[in-house]
Design a protein with these regions (language model features):
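Glycine- and small/polar-enriched repetitive beta-structure motifs of secreted/surface proteins
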Residues: 1-194
Length: 194
């Protein structure tokens, strides 16, 4: 069974099951997707996939534009709100965490398996049809790893306020920065540890 409260909540649902939505426009375009939870104005608004998706969006505009992503968890306003394709297995908590991540339509592009906790943590960018891989990153702390834009990033870890905040280079995979403003000025470079 489904539970929907709010103007146009689950508006298009035909045979989706086990969905819970509360708020205006939550899960509005979902026709057949299952096991989603959307709480907050326009959370999961454009999701429309016929799979057991298990997405959880709590907060205004969370996962608002996503269409097919699965197993995402977002808590806070404007979290993962630009993601609009198959972004999956991401956990983002805090105002505007992963707010600009959008893997685009390129078949090889990935924005999966990331963890972002804190204000604007792991902001990301729109890949604009490029085969960018943005996977396995961890950002914990306000503005941690927030400057990557649309560049590739794999296995990068930033823990602490503004840790790796200036990192923009796509050749910085495997870098680990722990502590207040740790490697704050680093813009590129693989395998650094601080």
């Amino acid at each position: 069974s489904n539970h929907a409260i709010g103007y146009q909540s689950q508006l298009a649902n035909v045979d989706g099951v086990a969905n819970v939505s509360f708020g205006r426009g939550t899960l509005a375009t979902n026709v057949s997707g299952n096991h989603n939870t959307a709480i907050g104005h326009q959370a999961l608004e454009t999701f429309n996939s016929d799979v057991d998706a298990y997405n959880t969006a709590v907060g205004m505009n969370n996962l608002q534009a996503i269409t097919t992503g699965i197993y995402n968890t977002s808590v806070g306003a404007l979290v993962l709100d630009a993601a609009s394709f198959g972004e999956s297995f991401n956990t983002a908590i805090g105002f505007a965490a992963m707010t600009s991540v959008n893997e685009g339509a390129h078949a090889s592009a990935q924005a999966d398996h990331n963890v972002a906790v804190g204000y604007n943590a792991l902001e990301g960018g729109a890949f604009a049809g490029n085969p960018v891989v943005f996977t396995g990153n961890i950002a914990i702390g306000s503005l941690a790893l927030d400057g990557t834009g649309a560049n590739a990033q794999t296995g990068t870890i930033a823990i602490g306020y503004e840790a790796l905040t200036a990192l923009t280079g796509s050749s910085s995979s495997g870098t680990v920065a722990i502590g207040y403003q740790s490697m704050e000025a680093l813009t590129a470079g693989d395998g650094n540890t601080a």
